[in-house]
Amino acid sequence: MSDRKYFGTDGIRGKVGDSPITPDFVLKLGWAAGKVLARHGSRKIIIGKDTRISGYMLESALEAGLAAAGLSASFTGPMPTPAVAYLTRTFRAEAGIVISASHNPFYDNGIKFFSIDGTKLPDDVEEAIEAEMEKPLTCVESAELGKANRIVDAAGRYIEFCKGTFPSELSLNELKIVVDCANGATYHIAPSVLRELGATVITIGCEPDGMNINEKCGATDVRLLQERVLAEKADVGLAFDGDGDRLMMVDHLGNKVDGDQILYIIAREGLRQGQLKGGAVGTLMSNMGLQLALKELGIPFVRAKVGDRYVLEAMQEKGWRIGAENSGHVILLDKTTTGDGIVAGLQVLTAMVRNHMTLHDLCSGMKLLPQILVNVRFSGDHNPLKSENVEEVTRQVEKELGDRGRVLLRKSGTEPLIRVMVEGDDAESVIAEMANRIADAVKAAG
């Protein structure tokens, strides 16, 4: 990917009120995107958002920009990111736009685009939009201005789509499920999907107020879900992030089940059913335990760069159908075009029901190696990873680990953070000490 001025690995993101997440910038972005997308013929755009209070302001700005370029907008209201991808396909819209900062706090927001086929916008189109941003905004003739409307049945359409990914001969009648929607975009979707498939559902994180999205709940903080699963004696817990493209789970014993374990369960079930095509794609952050467990099953495994767009690229290159990040982005190309927390959760529930096994038992074939991740914030105007001291400390740790572990240092694609990951088969306290040693060097350099 070439250097961009605005687009990162997952669209454009930042703090609301600071450039680029300002009303004037987003209006110009809508206009620039409209000018580029209008070249392809269709003049219809789907716009969805999560539950952040700033979503109202930003969707109005986007719609004004699109209208000035002659494109019409169809609003879905609060809707998971994968739902917008699905609706973009079914409405044959030229593009889908999601207003969300995913797992970030409410004061952040972002804009990301989907193509007509429900996949992330290609690099060359994003670059064309950036080029258009440099031009002065002009308005089409009055008769050619875009219009706006609401898709009143958007939620119902997506609920039926999700249910269709669960086998019709099975039901969730025997399961008691706690679902945590992070006070985000799945709050009015996920509970309905699970209830309509027969489950007894207890909800948390389903009362968004515009400011409580991802706050001590959802896929990035499952402590509340763990407590509730144990208190309710539930069979399983599902946690989504603010825009519904990530999934974390909790077993009946209160143990967290991450994206690596979810990928393992889905891959193994695909193998059992004779439906697995090729292998599975993880990332540089995927636990070595996943790689070893898949190898034992004879399932090929490759690592992509971190970021769901890179997982998808690797899947497409290989012709494989399943991939995931340990953060909970799970992509199942036989069912969806992008990461979908609800659909991924339904595939794990399918394995539980079909095999009469608990989530804990389904995870038992994979042993997670201790993996410590430390996030170090830096000023953003230089790269601490180029520090000689950081390189020297990293070499020392790698020498201590030998072939029993690995070190990964990388810059976040969305925030001014250096992520320090150390993994190995030593005791967790030993691995943590190694990670903190490197993190201290990064802090000193930052």
Curated annotation (Swiss-Prot):
Co-factor remark: Binds 1 Mg(2+) ion per subunit.
Give the stretches traversing the membrane. Answer: none
The record's Pfam families line, in alphabetical order, gives: PGM_PMM_I (PF02878), PGM_PMM_II (PF02879), PGM_PMM_III (PF02880), PGM_PMM_IV (PF00408)
Give the gene name: glmM
Keyword terms of this UniProt record: Isomerase, Magnesium, Metal-binding, Phosphoprotein
Specify the protein name. Phosphoglucosamine mutase
Q: What is its EC number?
A: 5.4.2.10
What is the role of the protein in this entry? Catalyzes the conversion of glucosamine-6-phosphate to glucosamine-1-phosphate.
Write down the InterPro entries for this protein, in alphabetical order. Answer: A-D-PHexomutase_a/b/a-I, A-D-PHexomutase_a/b/a-I/II/III, A-D-PHexomutase_a/b/a-II, A-D-PHexomutase_a/b/a-III, A-D-PHexomutase_C, A-D-PHexomutase_C_sf, A-D-PHexomutase_CS, Alpha-D-phosphohexomutase_SF
Q: Which PROSITE patterns match?
A: PGM_PMM
Top enzyme category? isomerase
Q: Which CDD domains match?
A: GlmM
PTM description:
Activated by phosphorylation.
Lineage top rank: taxon: Bacteria
- Catalytic activity field: alpha-D-glucosamine 1-phosphate = D-glucosamine 6-phosphate
The annotated active site, in chain numbering, is S102
Which HAMAP family has this protein been placed in? GlmM_B (MF_01554_B)
Q: Which residues carry this modification: Phosphoserine?
A: S102
